[in-house]
Amino acid sequence: MGSPRLRTQFEKLYTHYNNNDSGVQIDDIADLLCCTRRNTRMVLKKMSDEKWIIWNPAVGRGKSSILEFISTPDAVYLSLARQNIEEGKLDVALELLDGNQDALLDLINNALGVSHEKGKQVVKLPYYRQLHILKPSLAIRRSEQHLVQQIFNGLTQWNKAGDIEGDIAHHWEMLSPTHWRFYIRPSISFHDGKLLAFEDIKETFLALKSNFVFAHIHSVSSPSLNIIDFALSKSDHHFASKLAQFNAKIIPTTAHTQQDYSRYPVGTGPYKISENTDKKLILTANEHYFGYRPLIDSVEVWTLPEVAPIQLKLGLEVSEGPESYSSYGEKVDVDKGCSYLLFNRKTGVAKDKNWQVYLSQVITPLMLLNELQNSQMNGIGLFNAYGLLPGLQHCLNRAKVPFTLPSKGSVVHLGYEKEHPLYPLLGKAIEQRLALDGIVLKTHPFDTLDLLCEEKTQSIDMWLRGMSLGTQCPEALLSWLFAFNEIERATPEEDFIQITMLIDNWQSSPENHFPVNEICRYLVNSDQILPLFHGWMGISENANNSIQNASCNGLGWFDFETVWIKPEIN
């Protein structure tokens, strides 16, 4: 796009000669640009190569040459700003636009969405943070969990109705409640070309044995080619459904020791990682996928932390507010989860009953929603939660328990994830409310991986967290409960045993339904968790009618492998 000096020279040339209909002299241009004749010719050649001008030099000294402008300085700077936006250099782009944030936002919105590039169908999406933790066992946030579904496969999977169906395994059978057999599709390969082997499956599940959900796996064996047997230490009539969880996706044996695997994972799924920088994540279609090859060739997720999510008007994004719900038609749905406060009743102040009652009664969803109304996140489609999942009403009609105000000057520690648009605002609102009672709140933003470290988290008194099942299947609650031990670390041992007993009872019989209602009620009634908000999710029908089959999944995204772009036919 030319050097800064060349652009300055072009601007000077354009200002002087734009309305000149007669010929120009090379000597006059040289004087204007303060260059020698030789350097002036080089400058004009570069401008011509950039397609800013048409330069037809005359032959012979003193004769007039023809200078024609085919671009303007504004167009040059606009084009350069677009290029910098593509590269994620928003600060440079804003400077080129003379600090005009509206112009910057327009350029960003124009660059995003659906496009055709070199015969390929490309979808570009904005996101407010980097996506570098894509290993299934570490995917603690829901956007990472969505991407894991695009990059990896499990032995089984849940469909949109929440029913279990085959994935890497095409059939399975329960030989006994402690012996399950899975039949594997042949010739499945990872993105790097390596064939999926028994050892990959075995090592994936042996690495998960510290998780309560998979702790009863006694051994994994292969009695014959493309057959996998699981021997369990206790009866489990629902084992096949458990294998559909996001953290049970199959990874290669090399992933367990590869240092950068979380950022550059290799799976078997419909999309593979082709780039994952601080500015951009690019997924490209897996040409050798064992299922249906995706119709979208490439998905780019741009990291745009400087731009508030509510300002981005992209039709492929989750609805960010109620102001245009009419345009979302029947595609609007409620997130299958909620934002919540998790109280540390094990090592935090909430282990004291009076503190527990005080915090759960003075911090209310309505109070926090009112504070959000006055912030930049006003209108993001949140509403009061009466239970952990939409439809549950465990918070209603609960008796108010009397409490004594804690001592003035007492300190409460609140933890939450870094790079979250809501949590700092909610933390500020909680701080202001507790200050009315003389209580000091100290907030602690955590890096995502630090959330998994018990040593770093045990001093936190309460957590701002969020959960989403991502499916209609209630068993998905197991991933939230056990994948990262967050709930266990904050729950008294005797209470957590009650939850595990409910699950043991469920898996002991094929007739038992998953106790999602009982578990959620127990967590709310014990004041372990205070549900805060549910959220609306949807795909706009207005912004881009060429995208087909785009519906919002349970993790707030649309499934990349199922959408396609309808071509325009004249």
Where in this protein do the model-derived segments appear?
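A bilobed periplasmic-binding-protein/Venus flytrap-type ligand-binding module shared by bacterial periplasmic
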Residues: 284-287, 332-358, 362, 371
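Ligand/substrate-recognition segments at binding pockets and active sites
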Residues: 19-28, 33-39, 51, 55-57, ...
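Surface-exposed binding/hinge segments that line
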Residues: 213-256, 270-275, 280
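A structural "hinge/loop" feature
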Residues: 130-144, 239-245, 540-561
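Ligand-site clamp/hinge motif
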Residues: 288-328
